[in-house]
């Protein structure tokens, strides 16, 4: 990986805000970029595949063999644990997640965490970075197919023509921007979408309804399962096809890193991790 100093575009703020990235603040910087070799990219791809495989094995171990870990260490109520097991056993599909890696002194990716439930930095990585690259380095390639992958995944997860609600904390600009971008990818895939605030969802008799009275059957929520478990346990059990599925609650808790190290202590991607209680 090579850090390269570059000259920022004089009008970059106007350009990225025109693409919906109006929550960039000071963290989008164009003074430098990073160049990877093909071998480094292939190593990251392999590390990501292997990391997700290990996370799935760790989740299976916790959900199927160590359910007391969910209640005791993750502090998940028994009725929610039961729903997690059902969700996992039914292979409820996931849309996406984000691994955070560091590169050690040998250049080997090491897992810091898996943002399994409410990952952001999505619009930036898929659209904004691409526009910058095309304008500044058109001869180079971008290492990701996020946008195309999202469009295809909607088709793989939900029946054609479905209505999909997108819910989150709309008073947060980053969450709103992420939801609007995700909704646009679903629309590109041929789905009808509605974006609403989590507080606008009305729970009645185990069903959720939007402000217009329409039943919410399929919903992507950019809202942590941990919060929902605390605020609305009954809502967690409602008849909704959620993205992300509720089994992501297990993967998103950093306590799973200790299980990952227990199961895969010799993996080059896993850092030592222990629980103090």
What are these regions (language model features)?
Residues 1-277:
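Preference for protein termini
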């Amino acid at each position: 990986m090579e850090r390269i100093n570059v000259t920022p575009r004089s009008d970059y703020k106007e350009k990225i805000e025109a693409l919906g990235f109006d929550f960039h603040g000071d963290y989008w910087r164009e003074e430098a970029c990073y160049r990877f070799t093909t071998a480094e990219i292939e190593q990251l791809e392999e590390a990501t595949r292997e990391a997700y495989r290990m996370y799935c094995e760790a989740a299976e171990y916790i959900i199927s063999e160590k359910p007391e870990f969910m209640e005791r260490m993750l502090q998940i109520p028994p009725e929610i644990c039961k729903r997690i097991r059902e969700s996992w056993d039914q292979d409820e599909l996931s849309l996406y997640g984000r691994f955070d890696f560091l590169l050690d002194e040998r250049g080997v990716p090491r897992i810091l965490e898996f943002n399994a439930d409410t990952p952001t930095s999505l619009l930036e990585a898929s659209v904004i970075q691409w526009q910058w690259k095309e304008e500044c380095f058109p001869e180079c390639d971008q290492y990701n197919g996020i946008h195309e992958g999202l469009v295809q995944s909607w088709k793989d997860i939900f029946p054609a023509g479905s209505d999909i609600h997108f819910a989150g904390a709309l008073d947060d600009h980053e969450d709103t921007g992420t939801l609007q971008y995700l909704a646009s990818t679903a629309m590109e895939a041929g789905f009808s979408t509605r974006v609403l605030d989590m507080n606008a969802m009305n729970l009645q008799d185990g069903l959720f309804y939007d402000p217009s009275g329409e039943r919410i059957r399929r919903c992507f929520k950019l809202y942590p399962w941990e919060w929902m478990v605390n605020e609305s346990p009954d809502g967690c059990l409602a008849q909704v096809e959620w993205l992300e599925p509720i089994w992501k609650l297990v993967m998103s808790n950093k306590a799973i890193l200790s299980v990952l190290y227990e199961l895969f202590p010799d993996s080059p991607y896993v850092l030592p991790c222990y629980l103090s209680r």
